[in-house]
Amino acid sequence: ADDYVRYDVKCGLRDLNGKGVLAGLTEISDIVSKKMVDGEEIPCEGELYYRGYSIQDLVGSALREKRFGFEETAYLLLFGQLPTETELSAFSAQLSYYRTLPKNFVRDVILKSPTQDMMNSLAKCVLSIASYDDKTDDISLPNVVRQCMQLIATFPLYAVYRSEERRVGKER
């Protein structure tokens, strides 16, 4: 909490001065971009850690076991630990349940007003999907977890539909 005061971290993404959340303060992720060699800091190949786990180890494990690691990593980021098989199965089932978009969402939000930029398209989808949530102001933990899970479940859909729209648009 002291770091939040010391670095003047605001709630939310940005304040009027453009300051935002410093990722390192949350201890959810960490990066290594320099190493000490003979008392001197030198650049190194980057290393990324989620909740203390090397992303290389997470990916390596998923590849060795011939499985996808997306849902396991999402669980780790949300809940702070790797899931058991039972927890992962329940989490995956919940994501599957949330992996639907409202009727006409693709047509009205993605197809009717396409953008050239993928990030703008994704941002538009996230902002638009909020209008379908009747509990946007509920900041209780269960509701925020639900909202996070819905975003985790639907975000890949936004990217796929937007990419498909761009591909089909180029063929016209």
Model-derived features: positions:
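Hydrophobic alpha-helical bundle cores within soluble ligand-binding/oligomerization subdomains
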Residues: 1-172
